[in-house]
Amino acid sequence: MFRTRLISGIVIVLLTLGLMMKGGIVLAAALCVISLIAMYEFYRATGVTTQEPKKINAFEVVGLIGVVVYYAILVSPVNELYLLLTLITLLITLMFVYVFTFPKYHARQLMAAFYGIVYAPVLMSFIYLTRMLPHGEYIVWLIFISSWMNDTCAYCVGVLIGKHKLAPKLSPHKSVEGSIGGVVGAAIVAGLFAFFLVEKVMQEQAIVPVFVL
């Protein structure tokens, strides 16, 4: 088990490193695929996906097509306002599906279908947007470093001094102390990363507090 996790972890790190260095349409395509998988799993977990085998419903079709269109616009040389218009169009389309097929779908499926688009694909696209910023090849690592250090610090602090449960029913092993330790640890490491690496590249002192936040 440990060996499998170690190997998979190394592979993921190498792939992440390669994609972040490459950037551009290759990174966007990879994020699009990951987003589609994540959204599909979210749809399954929230009941958007139909229970009938080998069948997909209209909400899934709108979501899948919408994500591909969203990423196509993301990499195209158009105003980023079109990304917002795409999301609004997807919401209206989902509402049309709900109204004209009523009562086939529940309102909660409609809400989950739209939230699934925002939760995975849209948030994932910020990796691409960050990477495409000036000096983005350095800045983008703050996303991963902050996430990794938050998990690591939260685990270590929770194991050492965690006594108060954060959400006993949802996640019984997480503690208040661990969650605070994760946030503080991630902020400190992100600040150090910005100060010692990104700061040297960009030569803008004001950038450090922005990155920490």
What is each model feature region?
Residues F2-V212:
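Membrane-embedded alpha-helical bundles of polytopic integral membrane proteins
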